[in-house]
Amino acid sequence: LVLALAMYLRDQSMPLPKKLVMMSPWTDLTASGPSYQENYENDPLFGNTRESMIYNGEYAGKQDPKLPYISPLFGDFHGLPPMLFQVGSLEMLLSDSVLAAQKAKEAGCDVTLTVYQDMFHVFQLSMDKLAESRAAWDEVAAFLGK
């Protein structure tokens, strides 16, 4: 949602946020990235069932899932503010962050991508329970404080 909204704001010549923070973003509702297969059995939240991806139908409705405001991976990244992507290495959504970060860099954006090893979807919500979660929030604070 963060990327889709930023693209929309830019396209409407509206003010953009100064920075974008994305935690395990779902940027490709077509599920075409390699991690959808590679992490199929590793992802404790989405893995081992395609039914877990059912939300894409509710979100996209009858719209083409490749529309940039639905799947920002297929959009234009030019002119977007600095962005931080955080993602776990076990996520089916890993390639969504990796590919979006790559595309943003190619468009000249200031991009930070951090892949947290052996972490799952939105591990950041574990707050003080996991060292990786604490590190992720510290990274967000440092990124926003720049």
Report the location of each language-model feature.
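Alpha/beta-hydrolase superfamily serine-hydrolase fold, recognizing
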Residues: L1-K146
